[in-house]
UniProtKB/Swiss-Prot annotation:
This is DNA replication helicase. Associates with the primase and the primase-associated factor to form the helicase-primase complex. One of its GO terms (cellular component) is host cell nucleus. Belongs to the herpesviridae helicase family. Component of the helicase/primase complex. Unwinds the DNA at the replication forks and generates single-stranded DNA for both leading and lagging strand synthesis. The primase synthesizes short RNA primers on the lagging strand that the polymerase elongates using dNTPs. Possesses helicase-like motifs and therefore may act as the helicase subunit of the complex. ATP binds at residues 90-97. Keywords: ATP-binding, DNA replication, Helicase, Host nucleus, Hydrolase, Nucleotide-binding. The gene is HELI.
Length: 824
């Protein structure tokens, strides 16, 4: 008998699994609280943090590129910096995030993640306000864009018998180029008293989500900066000698930390696999023993993302390294469909394709775009991407690397993966041909070279953003039912930070105002409906009427004005059309013909306006629902904030006022969006970047229009990013990229999908995969939320694959250890 059958189907399996694990998840709080109470047995040397010797010189006396923190002549060897660690691992979708939620709710802790997507996802899960967004662990300890090009170095290893003290120094030495730069800047900032208190001074409990994708030396880097910052600012944590507790969360069988190096002289890139934090804590005897992993390991067992019993059993066999019995291999056969079916973009349109390599993803997009171009050209958007190369800086760069024959175009093609988010250019259908032109200034001088490429996207396709991007939410597109549900639940208001609440109320009022006329224009509207609509009580709003009396009907509104003249709605309609719609005029717009500026009203007045419009809107909705027996609610509502908006056949969305007025928001990587189109109109709050040359706007720089999962429409700001390369300690700002920071979610690599929950998945393992790994099979198949929505071109378990799950024996050993906390 299944658990759910005991409850008569009242609760689903996912709910029951989460509830059954809740009591033990709460025990994690006690475990972390206990570890975070540890204190130093003795004090660290006084002022140890002001002048620190490069740890590499302790292993290699002939090391020529030593970098000391502070003043070289005062530098002393780095003392050992103690720490505690707790390991929280589990199968995909097992509920590890629940443990983070519980810790955040019950303890004063610093919650971080290793990637932007994971950080934004946690911000959503924890319902963090704009001012308290979860940061990446890199940003938390002070990493910034100037450190991207700083190379990691190899540490000299004298022998294999290493203590934890030596291991810590060797790990820090690998990352010392970055560490020393951040530390020197922090010392300078304190001297100038310009630095705010760093995040690592807030608590001794530091949570790192998705710890399986960062290299092991980052663990010791976090420990170093905890002690460094707290010593620098003389915090109570430091004065009391509180030892940091690092909570490392992730799935060790999904770990995939990479070491990337770039040779400026040859312009060649080298990528190889490194040892991640989770693997180091589990497999490294020295580190594992010091952190007492045998006593400090929590394992989540059941997959709660997909509660299908057979599928969960299959995933657990891979997770724990159990032998794959013939019946399990036969079980996977049911997901197989022909490769030609999966590779045809016209099949399974709403399904996300996963591939092993970036080239396969790119080829799929090209095939998809070719078909769309033939079947419906207007659904294929082609957007320009610009790269501004600084000519003088490029010449200085050539001199520094000693490659005087290097030209801009070959350099660009070799470095495009470094100029912005790798997957954006590695996966997408970016034009092979590039256009180079020199930007000539008014005095005739040439300082920059402009490179133009083109990027393709499909209308109504699923997209994501590569980083947190400023946007202006301007409208709504969805059913009437959905919009009324949002109004009644106040979901939009709840998801808005407190400091933005007045703007949220004003924005929703503008949407209701713009959509109110649609009740009279609906195909379901009858004379009886119109009479009932006219009988709806519309209270007098004193401040609105006084505002109207101050407005002359002849005054022209400016682009940034929130006033809205409903007469614009009827542009293009004849008098006969208007009479057929409503011969007596809509009483709503007779009483409330204009909306005042948000900044001219108090919060109480905006709230009253919102409540009044909401009551009228819902009353009109109820009337039409009653007369149509619920059919009206299923119809489409498209409304924009205080604006009339139209769409051209080519996908361009334009305002009749030549300007969009919306609510300032942000698009984040954790969310899914639909590409609605693009606009060339002005967007209030976004404006133009004055640092960019005007030639870009003359050539064309559209903004993308997207829709979120709730149905709200936003205009994305353009993404401007700088590429700074570091060679021999010298920084070179070589390029500024102007693009859209978007990636299609129609297809991606299996590696990139890690950590995502996907409704429908189609995996293409290739025709004859040479480097197929068990971890790739596991990650790809475990993304799906329902195995009925999973298809694959082959059964990968019947192919030759590398069993790279070297963690499994350690997990099995931990499962047998009575000190391991198991959460089912």
């Amino acid at each position: 008998m299944s658990i759910s059958s005991l409850f008569g189907g009242r609760y689903d399996n996912k709910f029951l699994l989460n509830m059954s694990s809740a009591p033990k998840i709460e025990l994690i709080v006690d475990k972390v609280a206990s570890l975070s109470e540890r204190r130093l047995e003795g004090r660290l040397p006084e002022d140890w943090f002001r002048h620190i010797m490069d740890p590499e010189t302790e292993f290699n006396s002939e090391f020529a590129d030593a970098l000391c923190i502070g003043i070289d002549e005062f530098a002393q060897p780095l003392p050992f910096l103690p720490f505690k660690a707790l390991l929280v691992t589990g199968t995909a979708g097992a509920g590890k995030t629940n443990s983070i939620q519980t810790l955040a709710a019950n303890l004063d802790c610093i919650v971080t993640a290793t990637t932007s997507i994971a950080a934004q996802n946690l911000s959503v899960v924890l319902n963090r306000s704009k001012s308290a967004q979860v940061k990446t662990i890199f940003k938390t300890f002070g990493f910034n864009s100037s450190h991207v090009s700083m190379s990691e170095r190899q540490s000299y290893i004298a022998n294999d018998e290493r203590s934890i003290q030596i291991q810590q120094k060797q790990d820090l030495s690998i990352y010392w180029n970055v560490i020393s730069d951040i530390a020197d800047r922090a010392l300078g900032a304190v001297a100038c008293k310009t630095k705010e208190l760093p995040d690592l001074c807030e608590s001794s409990v530091i949570v790192i989500d998705e710890a399986g994708v960062i290299l092991r030396h980052i663990l010791h880097t976090v420990v170093f900066f905890y002690w460094f910052y707290n010593a620098l600012y003389k915090t109570p944590l430091y004065e009391d000698g509180i030892v940091p507790c690092i909570v490392c969360v992730g799935s060790p069988t999904q770990s995939n930390a990479l070491v990337t190096s770039f040779n400026p002289l040859t312009q060649n890139k080298d990528v190889k696999r490194g040892i991640d934090v989770l693997s180091a804590l589990i497999c490294d005897d020295v580190l594992s023993k010091y952190c007492e992993v045998d006593n400090n390991w929590i394992i989540f067992v059941n997959n709660k993302r997909c509660a299908d019993h057979a599928f969960g059993d299959f995933l657990k066999h891979i997770e724990f390294g159990l032998p794959l019995k013939p019946e399990l291999i036969e079980y996977v056969d049911q997901f197989v469909k022909p490769a030609s079916y999966i590779r045809n973009p016209m099949n399974e349109i709403e399904t996300t394709r996963l591939f092993l390599s970036h080239n396969e993803v790119k080829n799929y997009f090209r095939s998809l775009h070719e078909q769309v171009e033939v079947t419906n050209r207007n659904n294929l958007f082609v957007f320009p991407v610009y790269f501004l190369i600084k000519n003088k800086t490029f010449e200085d760069y050539k001199s520094e690397i000693g490659n005087f024959s290097l030209e801009i175009e070959p350099w660009f093609k070799s470095n495009i993966h470094r100029l912005n988010t790798y997957s954006q250019f590695a996966d997408q259908d970016l034009s092979k041909t590039v256009q180079l032109e020199e930007i000539v200034l008014e005095d005739g001088s040439v300082e920059e070279t402009l490179i133009t490429c083109h990027l393709k996207h499909i209308r109504n396709s699923s997209i994501g953003v590569t980083s947190k991007i400023k946007a202006s939410t301007v409208g709504f597109s969805g059913t009437y039912e959905k919009f009324v549900e949002l109004l009644q639940s106040d979901l939009f208001i709840e998801k808005t930070s407190c400091d933005q609440t007045i703007h949220a109320y004003s924005f929703l009022s503008g949407l209701m105002f713009g959509g109110m006329y649609s009740f009279c224009c609906s195909k379901f509207t009858t004379p009886e409906v119109l009479m009932e609509i006219k009988n709806i009580k519309m209270p007098s709003i004193e401040f609105l009427e006084s505002e109207m009396s101050r407005m002359s009907p002849d005054v022209q509104t400016v682009e940034t004005d929130e006033r809205y003249d409903f007469g614009l709605v009827n542009d293009g309609l004849s008098d006969v059309d208007l009479l057929e719609i409503d011969p007596c005029g809509d009483p709503f717009f007779t009483r409330y013909s204009k909306l005042p500026l948000t900044n001219s009203l108090s919060f109480e007045e905006i709230s009253l306006l919102y409540t009044t419009f909401k009551d009228i809107f819902i009353s009109r909705f109820a009337i039409l629902q009653k007369h149509t027996k619920g059919k009206f609610g299923k119809t489409l509502l498209v409304t924009y904030n205080r604006n009339n908006v139209s769409r051209k056949q080519c996908g361009e969305i334009y305002s009749h006022l030549k300007s969009f007025y919306g609510m300032l928001t942000y698009a984040i990587p954790a969310n899914n969006y639909t590409l609605e189109g693009y606009t060339n109109d002005n967007v209030v709050h976004l404006g133009t970047d004055k640092q960019l040359p005007q030639i870009l706007y003359k050539k064309g720089l559209p903004r993308l229009v997207i829709k979120d999962e709730m149905g709200f429409i936003s205009v994305l700001d353009n993404n401007v990013s700088k590429f700074i390369d570091v060679v021999n300690g010298q920084s070179f700002h070589l390029c500024t990229t102007v693009d859209y920071a978007t990636v299609s979610k129609v297809s991606m690599t299996i590696t990139k999908s890690q950590g995502l929950s996907i409704q429908k998945v189609a995996i293409d393992f290739g025709s004859d995969p040479k480097n197929l790994k068990l971890s790739s099979i596991y990650v790809g198949m475990s993304r799906v939320t329902d195995p009925n929505n999973l298809i694959m071109n082959v059964n990968p378990l019947r192919l030759n694959y590398e069993n790279d799950n070297f963690i499994a024996p350690h997990i099995v050993k931990a499962l047998k250890n009575e000190n391991t906390m198991l959460i089912f």
